[in-house]
């Protein structure tokens, strides 16, 4: 019996891009929507981002305050934990380094909370020194709630799973 059922051909990536894919990932031209729960739709006038916990003093930004911070546009490959990859995606957002300026902490790890109480833990070194952004635009357009809007944590060297960010 063949290892692959008849009619199933699998997914083949372009050989030119194969070296950009982690093992087991497949390329997609799409931006799949995969969620474990309902999609939050927080009105922008009610949204805020807060850094709190093991810090000397919590800091928060409203939507307008976040958008007023210096932003960067960056192009990265994204690789989702659900095995899809999309290459050369362009985002705009605020560097986590900008958000951490003036935040005194001895923490080595952070927890990122999404709207809806999903959390993920990360070493602080994975989101500092130019390695992560709080992105609010994708391909020049506001980030849709279905893709983590209004703002999501983008950490290009880690798998893509940090949606709809509200706390760090």
Map each language-model feature to its residues.
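Structured, non-membrane catalytic/scaffold regions adjacent to prosthetic-group chemistry
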Residues: 2-167
């Amino acid at each position: 019996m063949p290892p692959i059922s008849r009619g199933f051909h699998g997914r083949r990536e372009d050989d030119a891009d194969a070296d950009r894919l982690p093992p087991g990932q497949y390329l997609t031209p799409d931006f799949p929507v995969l969620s474990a729960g309902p999609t939050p739709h927080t009105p922008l006038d009610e949204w805020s981002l807060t850094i709190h916990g093991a810090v000397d003093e919590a800091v928060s930004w409203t939507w307008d305050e976040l958008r007023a911070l210096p932003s960067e546009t960056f192009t990265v490959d994204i690789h989702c934990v659900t095995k899809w990859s999309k290459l050369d995606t362009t985002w705009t957002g605020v560097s986590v380094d900008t958000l951490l300026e003036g935040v005194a902490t001895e923490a080595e790890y952070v927890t990122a909370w999404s709207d809806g109480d999903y959390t993920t833990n990360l070493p602080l070194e994975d989101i500092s020194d130019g390695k992560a952004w709080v992105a609010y635009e994708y391909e020049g357009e506001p980030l849709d709630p279905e893709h983590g809007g209004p703002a999501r944590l983008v950490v290009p060297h880690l798998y893509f799973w940090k949606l709809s960010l509200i706390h760090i």
